Amino acid sequence: MKNCVGDHTVIVPVMNGADPADRVRGYLSHGTVIDSLIYIVAFANADFSVTQQDQFANLHVGIQNASEAQWESILSVSRLLNGAGIDCEADRDIQAEIWKKYILNCAYNVETALYDNTIGQLRSDPKKAAEYEALVEEAYQVALAKGIHVEPKHRDAILHRFYYELADNATSSLQRDVKAGRQTELETFSGYIVKESKRLHIPAPVSERMYGQLGEICHKDGKAGTK
């Protein structure tokens, strides 16, 4: 891919996690890499088709502290995608948007995968619901320590979504991958937050415990690796 990238190339990695654009930047010395996140419920089928659940697919793009030239590239991407019928919003504070979704996934993906429970099963169990809250709080505290502009209202909105908005039968991609014995995004949804919590000296005992437990499940009998 490096040989295809020039100074005017614009790359928009649409991937899970808090740092995919930074990782792409580490591989490339040219071009503009734009951070992004997407809100969508979709999964791949055995025949390689993709099923989208619900009716939303909202993409956000941006670069933190973008220069004037970078912002023009971001706006060009937004105009291009909106013109193609893709709901795309350009965000000045893209890291806040990324982390609002990432904090949710640090709880949503991790706990559904560990217990192989739906969201309805988690929130109907007081102990598991309390663990979900702890996972959210730990990721939120890491975000604050990193200087991300998240506020208590954002954390509270994530918890409100858990208790009152998510469907009872909702599952996660990590849960489905672990159950099927496929490669997983455990490092994306759990390993990264545990690593950052240690680096920043932020206590994250529930995240650390579940990361260890899921790691054992994923590697049991060579059943599944991690991406």
PLM regions with names:
Residues 1-49:
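Rossmann-like NAD(P)(H) cofactor-binding subdomain of soluble oxidoreductases
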Residues 2, 82-83, 133-227:
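NAD(P)-dependent Rossmann-like dehydrogenase/reductase catalytic/cofactor-binding core
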Residues 3-6, 27-32, 47-153:
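Internal alpha-helical scaffold of NAD(P)-dependent oxidoreductase catalytic cores
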Residues 18, 63, 182:
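Gly/Ser/Thr-rich helix-start
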Residues 19-21, 43, 98, 160, ...:
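Generic structural signal for helix capping and beta-alpha/helix-loop junctions
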Residues 44, 114-115, 218-222:
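Short amphipathic alpha-helical interaction/hinge segments
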